[in-house]
């Protein structure tokens, strides 16, 4: 009539303290989320960085800009956003991508990663292929 009682149930304490999972993201405001989505859609290659391409304000942003330049990214297909100008943007992009650091690179609306990932992809040739597939490189002159 009564089923067997699991020994695990007997050994388990009646009260278990559960810690809620901690997430990097809080609820983004609708306006911030829409602004980030709009920025990501503004060009095939989008970089959220500290400073500007002409005047990067951190070594990682500078290294990422230099790598994109070495890869031959077409300036007409590139957009950069200075997160130092807007605290909501700075925190929002981290939450949006669930990536804790800046710079953050997007190609064709897909999050690629930060400086370390971009550098690794450049070394393996993956970045060149990704940018070529996105048609984001300066076209080669026909001779």
From Swiss-Prot:
Listed PROSITE patterns: GLUTAREDOXIN_2 (PS51354)
Signal peptide interval: none
UniProt-annotated location(s): Mitochondrion matrix
Superkingdom classification of source: Eukaryota
InterPro entries linked: Glutaredoxin, GRX_PICOT-like, Monothiol_GRX-rel, Thioredoxin-like_sf
SUPFAM superfamilies noted in UniProt: Thioredoxin-like
Domain Glutaredoxin: 33-138
Residues that bind glutathione: 50, 90-94, 102, 115-116
Listed NCBIfam families: Grx4 family monothiol glutaredoxin
Family: Belongs to the glutaredoxin family. Monothiol subfamily.
Function summary: Monothiol glutaredoxin involved in mitochondrial iron-sulfur (Fe/S) cluster transfer. Receives iron-sulfur clusters from scaffold protein ISU1 and mediates their transfer to apoproteins, to the 4Fe/FS cluster biosynthesis machinery, or export from mitochondrion.
UniProt protein name: Monothiol glutaredoxin-5, mitochondrial
Record organism: Lachancea kluyveri
């Amino acid at each position: 009539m009564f089923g067997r009682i699991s020994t695990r149930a007997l050994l388990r304490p009646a009260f278990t303290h559960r810690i809620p999972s901690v997430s990097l993201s809080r609820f983004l405001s609708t306006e911030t989320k829409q602004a980030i989505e709009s920025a990501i859609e503004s060009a095939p290659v989008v970089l959220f960085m500290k400073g500007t391409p002409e005047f990067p304000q951190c070594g990682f942003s500078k290294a990422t800009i230099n790598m994109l330049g070495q890869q031959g990214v077409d300036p007409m297909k590139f957009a950069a956003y200075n997160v130092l100008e807007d605290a909501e943007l700075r925190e929002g992009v981290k939450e949006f991508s669930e990536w804790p650091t800046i710079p953050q690179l997007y190609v064709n609306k897909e999050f690629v990663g930060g400086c370390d990932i971009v550098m690794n992809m450049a070394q393996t040739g993956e970045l060149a292929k990704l940018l070529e597939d996105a048609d984001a490189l300066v076209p080669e002159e026909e001779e």
